[in-house]
Design a protein with these regions (language model features):
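Short C-terminal tail/terminal secondary-structure segment
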Residues: 144, 225-226, 237-251
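Residue(s) in the substrate-gating loop at a strand-loop-helix junction
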Residues: 139
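Active-site helix of classical SDR
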Residues: 119, 155, 163
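Conserved glycine-rich cofactor-binding loop
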Residues: 9, 16-18
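Alpha-helical segment proximal to the catalytic Tyr-Lys
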Residues: 124, 168-169, 234
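Short, small/polar-rich loop/turn modules that mediate ligand/substrate recognition or access, typified
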Residues: 171, 176, 236-238
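A glycine/serine/threonine-rich, flexible loop-to-helix segment
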Residues: 1, 49, 53, 172, ...
Length: 251
């Protein structure tokens, strides 16, 4: 299936590893020009080189997405480098699990406000696109209460609500908004690999809850994200796509 992304411009926050990297790579594989940001400049540079090797325009910058000015600067720079913005994927999470003032503040600034600020900065460019879309990466922890209850789950739930509200507000401008909620996703250097090594009992419990007998891959999440972002999904807005291999049970 041709997703109609060739020549489109896609921005991905947290695009240097894991789910964000898989999303950026799939956009590039579909012919889209891609801009990424992450905190590590060397990792950003390596990803940009890899994306450019696929024959598309690619650009990136080291950014702390909790800094609104730096985030806006990256978005403005990406629009200038790529010639506009057709889609933005708000993917970064602090992964701050816990119930302390510090974890609540970190989740608020990184998960919630990076998304709000990204949308605000990208809107002037999205309004000029003929196939504009916003994808907000949430989590099944925002859909069902689980071991990540607390700041992480609460703000992931808020992101789903925010995406739904935005979809209603922006559809008249031709901008679609959807959320994607991954279940347990395993990759090299990711949180589940760290849990597997440091807390094997917790990892074993999590694995036992997965009906497929395994965790998901970043590429499986990316497939849902890129499809929803594409013109092929032109009638889909306001949904929360759950990519969890039947992990959650809520209707």
């Amino acid at each position: 299936m041709d997703l109609g992304l060739k020549g489109k411009s896609a921005l991905v926050t947290g695009g240097s590893k894991g789910i964000g990297l898989a999303i950026a790579e799939l956009f590039a594989a579909e012919g889209a020009n891609v801009a990424i940001c992450a905190r590590n400049a060397d990792e950003v540079g390596n990803v940009v080189k890899g994306l450019s090797a696929k024959g598309v325009k690619s650009w990136g910058r080291a950014v702390d997405v909790a800094d609104p000015d730096a985030l806006k600067g990256w978005i403005d720079g990406a629009a200038a480098e790529l010639g506009g913005i057709d889609t933005i994927v708000c993917n970064v999470s602090a992964l701050a699990v816990g119930d302390t003032a510090e974890t609540w503040e970190k989740s608020f600034r990184t998960d919630m406000m990076h998304t709000v600020n990204s949308v605000a900065a990208a809107l002037p460019y999205l309004e000029k696109s003929k196939s504009a879309s916003i994808i907000i990466v949430s989590s099944v922890s925002g859909f069902e209460v689980d071991v990540a209850a607390g700041s992480y789950g609460a703000f992931k739930a808020a992101l789903i609500h925010y995406a739904k509200g935005l979809s209603n507000q922006l559809i008249a401008k031709g901008i679609r908004v959807n959320a994607v909620s991954p279940g347990n996703t395993y990759f090299e250097g990711g949180i589940w690999q760290n849990i597997e090594r440091g807390m094997p009992d917790l990892y074993k419990t999590a694995m036992s809850l997965n009906p497929t007998g395994r965790m998901g891959t970043p590429q499986e999440v990316a497939a849902g994200v890129v499809f929803l972002a594409s013109p092929v999904a032109s009638r889909i807005s306001g949904t929360n796509l759950i990519v969890d291999g039947a992990l959650t049970k809520a209707v």
